[in-house]
Amino acid sequence: MITTAKTLLWLDDYRNPEKNDWLVFSPIGRDVNIIWVKSYNEFISYIINNSLPNGICFDHDLGEEKTGYDCAKWLVDYCMDNNLELPLYAIQSANPVGKENIDKLLTNFINKYELS
């Protein structure tokens, strides 16, 4: 029997998802194919070129002008434009305000568009 691991898109400019048990944040478990992207542009490029992953882990502060919140906004627009459900997600950011903003954005999208 052939099984294919699920894909986790790990957005973080600093934390290596394969070290220090960061995969505890994975919304789809630990048996995953990890794609580590470190910037807004890498995040968008991966999704456009490969489609949506099974799960996404968001960091907020990416060490550049664009943040994880900007990635989440782009993702919501992409899902709306393409009539897609949001992948399962988690937020591993140490920035409590950024974490809350990402979570509110994605939760509002799920409640307003996916449940209607």
Q: What label would you give each PLM region?
A:
Residues 1-116:
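Catalytic phosphate/metal-binding cores of nucleic-acid and nucleotide-processing enzymes, i.e., regions
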